[in-house]
From Swiss-Prot:
PANTHER family: PEPTIDYL-TRNA HYDROLASE (PTHR17224:SF1). Its EC number is 3.1.1.29. The gene is pth. The record marks 91 as: Stabilizes the basic form of H active site to accept a proton. HAMAP family: Pept_tRNA_hydro_bact. This is Peptidyl-tRNA hydrolase. Monomer. TRNA binds at residues 14, 64, 66, 112. It catalyses: an N-acyl-L-alpha-aminoacyl-tRNA + H2O = an N-acyl-L-amino acid + a tRNA + H(+).
Amino acid sequence: MWLIAGLGNPGLQYQNNRHNIGFMVIDAIYQSFSFSPWSKKFQAEISNGLIDGEKTFLIKPQTFMNLSGQAIGEVLRFYKLDLKNFIVICDELDLPPGKVRVKTAGGNNGHNGIKSIDAHCGTDYCRVRLGIGHPGSKELVHQHVLGNFTKSDQEWLSPLLDAIAKNIALLIKGDRCLFMDTISQATKNKNLQ
């Protein structure tokens, strides 16, 4: 059994923010597979289905980004899931737009959602970090992450979301290198800034 969590902030005013790319990926996965209707429990929106024959829960914490670990911790404990079967998808300022990095464990790199998960759940889980680019100045970070993706961002964002959804089974199978290579190939001809 697997848990895939996308990080973001709840509410219509945040749905197109760069910070919500994790929620966007979860929605793309949800649309690509047969998942149950969303239900609200564990301070989250949660759905379950099968990905490549593996029972999988999708979760979008509704606690706001900085408290994501509360909701995720509840789900992990309730279903008695091991961290090795947990994948979190989040935005990453320090990667160029559309770039993907996958790793297990490590630091939070200043990401408050990851910091919350680490505090509530531990650190030994798979992190899929999706580049949203850095605005260049620390003073502009808050405005950048809470800013909406632009029309030109859709040139790389839509293919990225689609490629991740179609290839998420590779991560569940444990083939991180092939996952990253496949995503890179699917988005390499897109206009990344």
